[in-house]
Structure formats: structure tokens, C-alpha cells
């Protein structure tokens, strides 16, 4: 579990650095916010790595997924960045971090639980930062939900902004998301963007002699 989250935190650091490189002309206050968030994500990565080491696990002992990088790195604008990273994958972590902090605490691993709890509270601010800039850059006639939904492109869809655990309305409200956005996301169902594997079975086929 910690290895999985460390993988995602490191990818977030790299994507934030990429955003700073890709968008040098973005507003200074936006770039400063990204840099501040990047530093917090570096802390998160360090916390996970240290805790993993204490548990006898090294980074790379398990599979490392490039999925978040492959989905977000093609971003073409700062609005793409906040829509996909801040308001999608970081929003999903409002569910995951809270859920697993509670699970770890119940299981007796208070040290790991505290790490997840601290990260959860940081993620609230990260989602809020993305929401602030979505509201600044979107068409003012659009709702937050419509503007965000329109900005997402396959394979990223709104379902990615929800964890596969309990839906955390409280954390989303603390991040500033409005009730229309929260209820729309709660109801939303779609593919998570993975292409299905198709298999063809030919009952008449025989092994070659």
C-alpha cells in the first residue's frame, strides 16, 4: 500500500516540475502555488520512503506504474494541469488518504496512519488550488462541474476523481467544491479509461502436428 502511494506521489512531483517547465508564461501566483505544492509532494514521497524502509520495503520492490504520467504529461495548458492532476487524481486521494488512514489506525499501525492523515489534509489544499484556477480560467457562464468535465480528455474521465473506497464529501467541501459538483461526481459512472482485453476462442482450432 505505501509503495503504491509513494509511486503516485513521485509521479505528482515530476508532473508539477513538468508544468513549471511547460508553462513559463503562466501567472506568477499560479506557478508559486505549483512550486509550493511540489515541495509538499516531495515531503509526502520522503515520508512514504522512510516508513517503507522501517517496514523492510525498498522503492522498486513492487511494480511501478507510469499511468498517471502517461495520462497527464501531454497537458497543453495550465488549465489542463489543474483539471487532470489537481482536480482529478489529487481529488481521488481525498478518498484514498482518509480511508486508509482510518484503516491503518484501526489495524494498529498508528505511524503509517498519521502519515496518511497529514497527506490527506495537504491534499485538501492542493485540490483547492486547482479549483481556484479552474474558476479563474473557465468561461464564467459554465458551472465548475461542466468546465472541468469539458476539459478532460480520454483516457481521463470524471470517474478517476473518485477513489474505489468510500466517497468523501466532507473533504471535497473543505477543498471548496460546490454541492452541484460533489453530487454530480457522486452520481457519475463511466469507464476508468482502460482498454479492455479481447480474446477470440476458436473451438475448431487444433494444435499443429
Predicted regions mapped to residue ranges:
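Non-heme di-metal
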Residues: 1-209
Amino acid at each position: 500500500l505505501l509503495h503504491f502511494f509513494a509511486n503516485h506521489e513521485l509521479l505528482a512531483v515530476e508532473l508539477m516540475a513538468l508544468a513549471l517547465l511547460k508553462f513559463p508564461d503562466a501567472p506568477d501566483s499560479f506557478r508559486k502555488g505549483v512550486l509550493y505544492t511540489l515541495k509538499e509532494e516531495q515531503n509526502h514521497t520522503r515520508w512514504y520512503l522512510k516508513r517503507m524502509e522501517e517496514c523492510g520495503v525498498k522503492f522498486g520492490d513492487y511494480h511501478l506504474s507510469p499511468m498517471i504520467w502517461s495520462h497527464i504529461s501531454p497537458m497543453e495548458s495550465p488549465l489542463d494541469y489543474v483539471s487532470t492532476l489537481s482536480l482529478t487524481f489529487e481529488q481521488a486521494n481525498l478518498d484514498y488518504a482518509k480511508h486508509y488512514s482510518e484503516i491503518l489506525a484501526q489495524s494498529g499501525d498508528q505511524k503509517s496512519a498519521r502519515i496518511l492523515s497529514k497527506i490527506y489534509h495537504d491534499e485538501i489544499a492542493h485540490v483547492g488550488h486547482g479549483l481556484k484556477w479552474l474558476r479563474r480560467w473557465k468561461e464564467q457562464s459554465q458551472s465548475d462541474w461542466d468546465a472541468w468535465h469539458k476539459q478532460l480528455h480520454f483516457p481521463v474521465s470524471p470517474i478517476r476523481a473518485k477513489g474505489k473506497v468510500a466517497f468523501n464529501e466532507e473533504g471535497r467541501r473543505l477543498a471548496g467544491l460546490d454541492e452541484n459538483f460533489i453530487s454530480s461526481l457522486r452520481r457519475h459512472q463511466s469507464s476508468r479509461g482502460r482498454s479492455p482485453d479481447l480474446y477470440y476462442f476458436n473451438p475448431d482450432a487444433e494444435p499443429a502436428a
